[in-house]
Design a protein with these regions (language model features):
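Loop-to-helix element that buttresses phosphate recognition and phosphoryl-transfer chemistry
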Residues: 3-5, 10-64, 138-145
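General small-molecule cofactor/ligand-binding pocket signal
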Residues: 5, 73-75, 212
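Active-site catalytic microenvironments for nucleophilic, acid-base chemistry
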Residues: 36, 61-65, 152, 156, ...
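Active-site metal-binding loops of divalent metal-dependent hydrolases
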Residues: 10, 169-170, 215-217
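Hydrophobic, aromatic-enriched interface-forming segments
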Residues: 111-157, 166-167
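Generic beta-sheet signal
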Residues: 4, 161-167
């Protein structure tokens, strides 16, 4: 039996002009995760990530604390959903029937909580819609790319390996939903609760894959409790 760790990137710079960059707190979160892996002898044989800066930087910080050099493979299929494009295409249509989205558009500057409400509406429509929008990647295409990327990682690494995959919430939710046989609106239920730097553990043998743990962030929560600092973040 082999292990696959799906790791959500550390906190990015939400609300700034460069969201993809890790925040100072995000760098600390990634360091805490790297120390956790090192101190508990959680050695990864290979590392994969998307090409986004927040994913690569989180991987680099964690891998830098591993005892041995670990090869880092970058695959754009592990990138986050292009949610800005999803908003751009769907909000003008959905705002006609959603007061929450109407308020979201009118307010302009948004809190994280406001954004989350809008995200749920837009995400669920995108996942369940049969419509094809020009210049917008469909859910079927996105999820298919994610599944193929993961299948290739598993096939390339073989049995008995521990692989770290540094990616984003949408990607992890897509994988977990697929493993559990969940589709449609329910996919969002695995997207919303994912914490920055959380670890989701999958076990695999050949083509068989099972979920061992989801959204584990106790190592960060423990540090937050001891230090009194707010280490736990969703974005």
């Amino acid at each position: 039996m082999a292990e696959l760790y799906l790791i959500r990137h550390a906190q990015a710079s939400f609300g700034t002009s460069d969201y993809d960059r890790l925040s100072p707190l995000g760098c600390r979160q990634a360091g805490v995760l790297g120390e956790y892996f090192r101190d508990y002898a959680l050695h990864v044989d290979a590392v994969n990530s998307g090409e986004l800066e927040r994913q690569r930087k989180t991987a680099n910080i964690v891998v830098g604390l591993q005892p041995d050099n670990v090869h880092h493979e970058i695959d754009p299929r592990l990138n986050e959903i292009e949610i800005d494009k999803v908003f751009e295409h769907l909000v003008p249509q959905l705002v006609k029937t959603s007061s929450n989205l109407e308020n979201f558009v009118k307010e302009g500057k948004h809190s994280s909580k406001d954004y989350q409400k809008a995200l749920e509406i837009v995400f669920k429509h995108w996942v369940t819609s049969d419509n094809d929008y020009p210049n917008l990647q469909s859910w079927a295409e996105y999820s298919g790319n994610v599944h193929r990327a993961l299948a290739e990682i598993v096939a390339n690494e073989g049995s008995g390996k521990t692989v770290g995959v540094f990616t984003s919430g949408g990607t992890i939710a897509t994988v977990v939903a697929h493993v559990l046989g969940v589709t449609g609106n329910q996919v969002y239920n695995f997207y919303e609760p994912l914490m920055n730097c959380s670890v989701t553990r999958l076990l695999y043998s050949g083509e068989k894959m099972s979920l061992s743990s989801f959204n584990d962030h106790l190592f960060i929560q423990s540090l937050a409790s001891k230090s009194g600092e707010g280490f736990l973040t969703y974005r």
